[in-house]
Design a protein with these regions (language model features):
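A structural alpha-helix within SAM-dependent methyltransferase catalytic domains
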Residues: 2, 25, 29, 49, ...
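Catalytic cores of alpha/beta
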Residues: 2-4, 40-52, 88, 92-111, ...
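Glycine-rich phosphate-binding active-site loops on the catalytic face of alpha/beta enzymes
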Residues: 3-19, 57-66, 106-125
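Short, well-ordered coil/turn segments that N-cap beta-strands
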Residues: 6-7, 31-33, 52-54, 82-84, ...
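Short loop-to-alpha-helix "cap/lid" segments that border enzyme active sites
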Residues: 16-26, 40-53, 63-84, 92-95
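Active-site glycine- and acidic-residue-rich loops that bind
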Residues: 30-41
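C-terminal helical cap(s) of enzyme catalytic domains, especially alpha/beta-barrels
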Residues: 75-79, 102, 117-130
């Protein structure tokens, strides 16, 4: 990834065992990459926080049902360390969603579907950031 010009990699805690997650984090950091470790539930959080995670993303999309709810981020927020970068991923639709997530301790959001389904992505992004 670094050779291809990437700045970061995504590591999904649900599909990596602890030692493999740790190994991939070490390799990423050693070549100058950031790593966004994605979690979906408390078990993923517990696994991820055993290692040197600097950026943690809570995916609000259930990978089995594909249903999305911001409640996933809100439910996990109190268990997440505030000294690392916290990202809420998926299901963010409004400026109010962003504000509520920020109030819950998240530093960043990952927005995809909401922008992709907009007729004018630029206008939709401006509305989210206004």
């Amino acid at each position: 990834a670094a050779h291809a010009g990437a700045d970061a990699i995504l590591l999904i805690a649900a599909i990596l065992d602890g030692p493999r997650l740790n190994d991939l984090l070490k390799v990423a950091y050693s070549v100058g990459l950031d790593a966004l470790v994605e979690v979906h539930d408390r078990g993923d959080v517990e696994k991820a926080l055993c290692y040197d995670v600097r950026m943690l993303g809570v995916n609000n999309r259930n990978l089995r049902t594909l249903e999305t709810t911001l409640q996933t981020s809100f439910n996990l927020a109190s268990e997440l360390p505030k000294e690392i970068t916290l990202v809420s991923e998926s299901g963010i639709q409004t400026r109010e969603d962003i504000e509520r997530l920020r109030a819950a301790g998240f530093h960043a959001v990952l927005i995809g579907e909401e922008l992709m389904k907009a007729e004018d992505e630029g206008k939709a992004l401006k509305a989210l950031l206004a």
